[in-house]
């Protein structure tokens, strides 16, 4: 399909999409579906490849050809509504999370700025998701704090805040929010929160039990099931279980282009030296920086004939992002510098910058490896102090290395 920017809004039609996408949740918890998508995929930092920037002179100029399936997000009229629909914005954020396409998150951000005050809690949460997608965690937390100050029983906002705290390495604060959700008998939100917390603590056995319980209760809903299966695959990968393949493959069976699942499965396969399988799986992947990096890393490790070409292409992606003022996913760029360029010093510098705002398992892993390669054990002092404060054992991170 074609993207024409002569209009200023995006439409998703009626509530059919909403009923289908959120059908697994009770009516008061529709927001959880969007939350699971956005928070699971936001760390990917995926930025779609872009052609050279030009300024069009004709209103009918085709700026870019977008992937199949975007038609539902495009304008159905050339007349822009004065106030965009929150449902439209949520659809954009959900699709951006599934596809890794930052263009859609940017569009959602622009539409959010046009909503009239005062912001409802639903709008505050959507703005927080958009902020997290661009890695502005401070703004995201501020928005969620505002929502919870207005309504301490906003369980969706509390779950969102806990997830961001986990990404930033504040397990102590996330534990409080998870506890509040559980004590408040918010079964769905509490379970998702506890799964994320136990995974980050490195308790794969407990996380697996929680996910298995939800899988048994999920019924036939494809969206919830796909999310849970991918999460179960990540847990198995971190634990070194041999059944990780089946979990990832079951998740991909219903959504072969799901960015989050593809990236996690690719990391798992590469960690086990199965690089040729990664190349087969990512032969025609969604065009995101994160998946293209996985492809380049696999080609490099396998000695593939196109490895040099893929590495050069990845470098151009990062150069273009910097040229237009966009910061690529720092841990991915650090991986590129360390593994594909052999520049441990630059990789360590970037990994340290990344660690200031993201402290997930993969963030810790790239920092440790970059410091080791650069012969800079002193660079890990901050990491070690933080791990002690959060009662984490760095020797048992269980990461499926990138």
Regions found by a protein language model. Give the residues of each.
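N-terminal leader/linker segments that initiate helical-solenoid repeat arrays
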Residues: 44-122
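Start-of-helix register in tetratricopeptide repeats
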Residues: 83, 90, 122, 156, ...
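Canonical tetratricopeptide repeat
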Residues: 87, 126, 160, 193-194, ...
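Residue-level recognition of tetratricopeptide repeat
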Residues: 90, 94, 129, 163, ...
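Register position in tetratricopeptide repeats
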Residues: 94, 133, 167-168, 200-201, ...
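Alpha-helical repeat scaffolds
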Residues: 105-113, 138-146, 171-182, 205-216, ...
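Short coil turns that delineate tetratricopeptide repeat
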Residues: 118-119, 152, 185-186, 219, ...
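Alpha-helical adaptor scaffolds
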Residues: 129, 225, 312-345, 352
């Amino acid at each position: 399909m074609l993207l024409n920017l002569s209009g200023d809004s995006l439409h998703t039609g009626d509530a059919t999409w909403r009923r289908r996408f959120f059908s697994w949740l009770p009516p008061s918890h529709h927001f959880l579906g969007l939350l699971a998508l956005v928070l699971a995929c936001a760390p990917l930092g995926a930025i779609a490849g872009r052609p050279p920037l030009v300024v069009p002179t004709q209103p009918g100029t085709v700026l870019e050809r977008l992937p199949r399936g975007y038609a539902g997000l495009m304008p159905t009229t050339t007349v822009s509504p004065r106030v965009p629909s929150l449902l439209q914005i949520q659809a954009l954020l959900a699709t951006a999370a599934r596809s890794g396409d930052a263009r859609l998150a940017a569009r959602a951000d622009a539409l959010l700025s046009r909503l009239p005050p005062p912001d409802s809690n639903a709008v505050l949460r959507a703005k927080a998701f958009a902020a997290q997608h661009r890695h502005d965690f401070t703004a995201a937390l501020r928005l969620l704090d505002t929502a919870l100050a207005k309504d301490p029983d906003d369980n969706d906002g509390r779950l969102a805040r806990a997830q961001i705290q986990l990404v930033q390495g504040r397990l102590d604060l996330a534990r409080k929010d998870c506890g509040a959700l559980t004590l408040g008998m918010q079964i769905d939100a509490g379970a998702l929160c506890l799964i994320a917390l136990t995974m980050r603590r490195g308790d794969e056995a407990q996380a697996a039990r929680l996910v298995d319980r939800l899988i048994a209760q999920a019924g036939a809903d494809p969206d919830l099931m796909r999310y849970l299966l991918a999460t179960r695959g990540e847990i198995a990968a971190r634990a070194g279980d041999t059944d990780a393949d089946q979990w990832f493959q079951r998740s991909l069976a219903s959504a072969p282009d799901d960015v989050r699942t593809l990236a996690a499965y690719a990391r798992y396969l590469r960690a086990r030296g199965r690089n040729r399988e990664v190349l087969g799986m990512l032969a025609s992947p969604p065009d995101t920086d994160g998946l293209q990096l996985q492809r380049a890393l696999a080609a490099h490790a396998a000695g593939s004939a196109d490895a040099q070409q893929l590495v050069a292409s990845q470098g151009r992606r990062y150069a273009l992002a910097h040229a237009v003022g966009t910061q690529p996913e720092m841990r991915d760029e650090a991986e590129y510098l360390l593994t594909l360029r052999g520049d441990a010093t630059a990789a360590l510098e970037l990994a340290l910058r990344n660690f200031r705002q993201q402290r997930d398992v993969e963030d810790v892993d790239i920092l440790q490896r970059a410091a080791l390669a650069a012969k800079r054990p002193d660079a890990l002092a901050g990491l070690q102090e933080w791990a002690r404060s959060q009662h984490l054992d760095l020797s048992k991170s269980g990461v499926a290395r990138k």
